[in-house]
Swiss-Prot record:
GO CC, any one term: virion component
GO biological processes: symbiont-mediated suppression of host innate immune response; symbiont-mediated suppression of host JAK-STAT cascade via inhibition of STAT1 activity; symbiont-mediated suppression of host JAK-STAT cascade via inhibition of STAT2 activity; symbiont-mediated suppression of host type I interferon-mediated signaling pathway; viral transcription
Matches recorded under CDD domains: RABV_P-protein-C_like (cd21032)
SUPFAM superfamilies xref list: Phosphoprotein M1, C-terminal domain
Subunit structure: Homotrimer when phosphorylated. This trimer is stabilized by binding to the L protein. Binds soluble protein N, and ribonucleocapsid. Interacts with host STAT1, STAT2 and PML.
Signal peptide: none
Residue ranges, compositional bias (Polar residues): 136-162
Positions of disulphide bridges: none
Keyword Protein biosynthesis attached: no
MF-aspect GO terms: RNA-directed RNA polymerase activity
Protein name: Phosphoprotein
Length: 297
């Protein structure tokens, strides 16, 4: 019988990806609960109302008004019927996000990378929101057009459309400058770029977290050292690794990173044990050689 050996670093990377997926689902559910906090109020009990309000008979006034206007009865009945058929879009959106979270966890278990899954999920969520929650830009234009005076419309009918378009363009430009860049463009240019770089660096470091690398010692020999001996969180190691020249560009392109150079960089600034063992002059030369070799590939 042949035995199958599983690399512990692969298990750690998979567990970290699953934790990130679970945290993402929890964050989405928490945001939905915060947005629906106004819908979770307790109902008002009739017994807790004052005595004067209890004595009011609402049915009489309502029946008289309905009898006087039979057309209102039909309109209200039709409106109530239409409102019953329409479901709350927030509830549909919450169920949609729950299904998205389940799909993310399933894809993570198959071995796909978290950033690839998350980028596709973001596009799906944005398209869903754009279809089911359209912006109300038409209402703003109608309100602005009604503010024009009738005198200008009568005297200068040809110039009013141009003025209105100029006003709308100015207000739109002012709104854009005040609110900053659009959410989609901002996320694709900055947030997703940083997240992809950090995810790639964390993935490669996690794969070789227990691998030992050779470093020159003070006693003209060598010693072995790995990322586990740093006793640091993976997030802190990633932040320090981004300050190494050339690492960010390599991670953005999905290329292999000089992990020994990163380990030497982080260890020389955050590990006293590493500082006591390593020969600083030879370490600088090795780190520079590793960077040149990986950048030239």
């Amino acid at each position: 019988m042949s035995k199958i050996f599983v690399n512990p670093s692969a298990i750690r990377a998979g567990m970290a990806d699953l934790e990130m997926a679970e945290e993402t689902v929890d964050l989405i559910n928490r945001n939905i609960e915060d947005n629906q906090a106004h819908l979770q109020g307790e109902p008002i009990e009739v017994d807790s109302l004052p005595e004067d309000i209890k004595k009011l008979d609402i049915s009489e006034g309502r029946s008289k008004s309905l009898v006087d206007n039979p057309q209102d009865v039909e309109c209200r009945m039709s409106e109530d019927f239409q409102m019953d058929e329409v479901e709350d879009p927030n509830i549909q959106f919450q169920s949609y996000l729950d299904n998205i979270g389940i799909q993310i966890v399933r894809k993570m278990r198959t071995g796909e990378r978290f950033f690839k899954i998350w980028s596709q999920t973001v596009e799906e969520i944005i398209s869903y929101v754009g279809v089911n929650f359209p912006s109300q830009s038409g209402k703003t234009t109608e309100n602005k057009s009604t503010q024009t005076t009738p005198k200008k419309v009568k005297t200068e009918p040809s110039s009013t459309p141009a003025k209105r378009s100029d006003q709308l363009s100015k207000t739109e430009m002012a709104a854009k400058t005040a609110s900053g860049p659009p959410a989609l463009e901002w996320s694709t240019t900055n947030d997703e770029d940083d997240v992809s770089v950090e995810a790639e660096i964390a993935h490669q470091i996690a794969e070789s977290f227990s691998k030992k690398y050779k470093f020159p010692s003070r006693s003209s020999g060598i010693f072995l050292y790995n990322f586990e001996q740093l006793k640091m969180n993976l997030d802190d190691i990633v932040k320090e690794a981004k300050s190494v020249p050339g690492v960010t560009s390599l991670a953005r392109d999905g290329l292999r990173l000089p992990l020994r150079c990163i380990l030497g960089w982080v260890g020389s600034s955050h590990s006293k044990k590493f500082q006591l063992l390593v020969g600083s002059e030879k370490l600088n030369k090795i780190m520079q050689d590793d960077l040149n070799r990986y950048m030239s590939c």
